[in-house]
Every structure is written in C-alpha cells, then in structure tokens.
Amino acid sequence: MPTIRPDEISTIIKQQIEQYNQEMQVSNVGTVLQVGDGIARIYGLDKVMASELLEFEDGTTGIALNLEEDNIGAVLIGSGRNIQEGSTVKSTGKIASIPVGEALLGRVVDPLCNPLDGKGPIQCTESRLIESPAPGIVDRRSVYEPLQTGITAIDALIPIGRGQRELIIGDRQTGKTTVAVDTILNQKGQDVICIYVAIGQKQSTIAQVVGILTERGAMDYSIVVAAGADSPAPLQWLAPYCGATIAEYFMYQGKHTLVVYDDLSKQAVAYRQMSLLLRRPPGREAYPGDVFYLHSRLLERAAKLSSQLGEGSMTALPIVETQANDVSAYIPTNVISITDGQIFLESDLFNAGIRPAINVGISVSRVGSAAQTKAMKKVAGSIKVELAQYRDLEAFAQFASDLDEATQKQLARGQRLQELLKQPQYSPLSLDQQVAIIYAGTRGYLDDIPVEKVSSFKQGLLAYLGTTHPKYGEIVLSTKQLTDEAEEILKTAITEFKQSFVAKAA
C-alpha cells in the first residue's frame, strides 16, 4: 500500500481548493401530476413562459400551453410512453425553434426538421423561431408580380400574385392537391422555392406527391414538411408554422417562395383535440375560441416585402376540405375571410369530367388581377363573362326547346371555352401556350370545330406553334405582352393549322 507524505496531502488539498467551482446551476424543475393522451399536467415550474419547451425525464420534449394557477398543461411532442406520475420536468428557457438553411432543399422533413427521407442528417447553421411575427404594414408592398400556376383556368380567370394568399377549397377527391402540385411543378426555372406541408395525410399520399416532385425534377427547388396521419396532434398543429418559418428564411433573403398547406382542416382538428384535452372551453363545432387566430397568424406571415427588405415574397396556398360542398361551415368561412380569394372545386363538375373542377362563378382572386400579365389580360378579359353567361343559359336551355340564333351561338361558344379550359393533371402550360389557346377560343376560331374535337385541336395547335412559329413564344415570354407582331404570328398560325385540321377531319 503506497504511503502519502504530509507535504503531498497539503498539495492535494490546495489543488482541490483551486479547482472548486463556486458557480451554482439553478434549474426550474416541476413534477408530473398526470399524463395521458399526449397531454401532461405539471406541478411547479413557476417561472415557465407560454409556449416554452420543457424537457421530461425520459428525454421527451413538451410545450407549455396552459399556464394555470396551480399547474401547467403541456402537450408532448413524442409518444411520452416512459413518462410516469411523479417524473421530473425541467424548463429549458427556450421557445420552439427549428434549423433552417439551403441544406433543406430537396429534403423531406418532419415539423422539427428531422429528416424522414433516409438521406442522412441535415447540416443547417441558422435557426428561426417557429412562431414569428408577421411583417408589418410598412414592411410590405402591394402584390404586383404574377405567380403562374400553369393551369389555364386559374391564370386566366383567378390569377394569383406573388405574396398573395389564395385558398383552394372543395370536397374530398375534387383535385385540390393536384392544383397545388401542378403549381409547384410550374415553378421550374422561375426561381421560386416551394414548400409543401402535408398535415394529417396518409403516408401513401405523401409518398405519391414526393414521387411526382422527384420524377419531374421539382425536388431541386422544393422542401416537403410531413406530419402524417400517425403523427401526434402537436406535430400536426406545428407543421404549417414550420413550413412558414422555412419560407421566411428564404423570403428575407430576397427570394420568392410558395407554401402549400395541405390541409388546414386537419390542423384545426388536431388543435381542437389538444384544446379539449387541456380542458379549454369549446365553442362552435367544439373548436376552441382562438381557432381563428390559429389560422390568421399563420396566413398573415405570407407577404410581398418592401424594396428596403429585399422584395422577397411568400405566397400561401392553404387547402381546406369541405363536407358536401358546405362553404359556410366554421373553418371554411374563417379561412375565406383571412385569404385574398378562393378557388372553389366542385364534386359535380369533377364527376362530369370538367377537370380542374373549378366553379368559376364563386371562385375569386381579390388582388391577383393587379399581377396578371398584360398578354393574359388582353385575351382573357371577356372569358369570365362569357363562361358565366353560358352557365346561366345552360340552365335555361334545359327547359326551353326553341332558342334564338344568338343564344345558340353563345351556348356553342361556352361549350367550347369550357372544353378548352380542361387540363390533365401534372401537365402545366407556359404563358405563351395559355394565351394562344384562349385567343383561339375567344376570337371565334373554334366556333365551327365540333366540341369533341376541341381537345385534339388544342394539342395540335400548341405543337404546331412550337415547331413552325417559335418566334411567337419568344416574344410573349420575354415581353409578357401580346404585341402586334406576336398577334399577327398567332393569327397566321391558327388559320394555317385550322385549315389542315379541318381538311384532315373531313
């Protein structure tokens, strides 16, 4: 056994005294009173903030939502299966934030930006708060640039501008997600970063969307935030805010972003579940009193920034699902009142083969017309009126047997315009193609073409224009206008193609 000399003992004691750290670590600790259904009631944690992150003994994270007199109601982000009554909880002193950066492009992540695509960790240097204040009045400017969706019916009749919030609303299986995905596909080469937020969707549906985006090369400029149907309610509630936070990072760098929230009905249901479990008083349709604020604070973050802030933009396309075309339910009316217009999709039109199934009569864009390109404005000015008149006459014509010639002409024109606006999914059209087909329809070139041949005429005309008259496309795409020269080329092309088309049909 080694012996220690007395002088060594004094040296050891001196070293121990020198190494002694007087700093005290103060942590705010509480105790779990009750846990279950993704909710925990905690005693203690006197100095906790609203929406502060909490750390449970088993490593689960929670968010403090209810700060009551004698306890705290927290929601669990995770299963929380190992949390027991009496477990300790620490407050972290942090509000929920996520890592953001260019590294997210092309990735599929959960609402906390953890990768779900098996492509390894995401290296981000910056982080942003999930709940950020929306830009103020001085920080914004009015919407003036178009966001081309590639869907002729929308770009001609319900145009969307960069920085706008346009609601896509309709029953299940009416093509809401298809409209949003088509819009993302059409942003290729437009320098727009797209974020698709899937809330409460089936995993197979999310995989299908990711598959289409990957196949078409759209994942190069897209990010998918997924909180599937099997995700805990708090993650489904946070997912849209996470998508907005990622978009804000790019927006404040002067870039243009597009965010699709698919869909906000499921986010409201997740929030209702959490609120009822936290014993918050229920209101209409059992939703809590602040469900309007839930969506307004999210959608107000979409903006077109002023020139001082770099002129970036965030365009929001929220999706809301209705039951039996009831637009007057609680969540649909809330979101309609917050957004700058809505695209209403109808199951009757969808089943009748009119796809995209847009009801032109009640769909509206409140600010998009200011952003519509001059070329589109020139050719599409009369199409909305003509379609609306056609719908009225169509209902009338079912009961009247003998119609005057003018009415018959109007009905024939309306049928052809309706046929012209049909478009298969995942095949967006460029601006010059849209202008060409609408010009052909509104200027009467299709009036003597049989309705069933309008679709093949449209396809043939676009192919003919691209091969024999490429200058037309160059002029329209570079100037965004239908100049006199472009119009002459277009007239010549339509006349030439129509002659050959009619000759072949005969």
Curated annotation (Swiss-Prot):
Localization per record: Cellular thylakoid membrane
GO cellular component terms attached to this protein's record: plasma membrane-derived thylakoid membrane; proton-transporting ATP synthase complex
Iron-sulfur listed as a keyword: no
Binding site for ATP: G170, D171, R172, Q173, T174, G175, K176, T177
One term of GO molecular function: ADP binding
PROSITE patterns: ATPASE_ALPHA_BETA
Chemical reaction(s) catalysed: ATP + H2O + 4 H(+)(in) = ADP + phosphate + 5 H(+)(out)
Site feature location: Required for activity: S363
Topology relative to the membrane: Peripheral membrane protein
UniProt KW keywords: ATP synthesis, ATP-binding, CF(1), Hydrogen ion transport, Ion transport, Membrane, Nucleotide-binding, Thylakoid, Translocase, Transport
Pfam families for this protein: ATP-synt_ab, ATP-synt_ab_C, ATP-synt_ab_N
Documented EC number(s): 7.1.2.2
SUPFAM superfamilies: C-terminal domain of alpha and beta subunits of F1 ATP synthase, N-terminal domain of alpha and beta subunits of F1 ATP synthase, P-loop containing nucleoside triphosphate hydrolases
UniProt-listed HAMAP family: ATP_synth_alpha_bact (MF_01346)
Quaternary assembly: F-type ATPases have 2 components, CF(1) - the catalytic core - and CF(0) - the membrane proton channel. CF(1) has five subunits: alpha(3), beta(3), gamma(1), delta(1), epsilon(1). CF(0) has four main subunits: a(1), b(1), b'(1) and c(9-12).
Biological function: Produces ATP from ADP in the presence of a proton gradient across the membrane. The alpha chain is a regulatory subunit.
Family in the record: Belongs to the ATPase alpha/beta chains family.
NCBIfam families per the UniProt record, alphabetical: atpA, PRK13343.1
Name of protein: ATP synthase subunit alpha
The species this protein was found in: Synechococcus sp. (strain JA-2-3B'a(2-13)) (Cyanobacteria bacterium Yellowstone B-Prime)
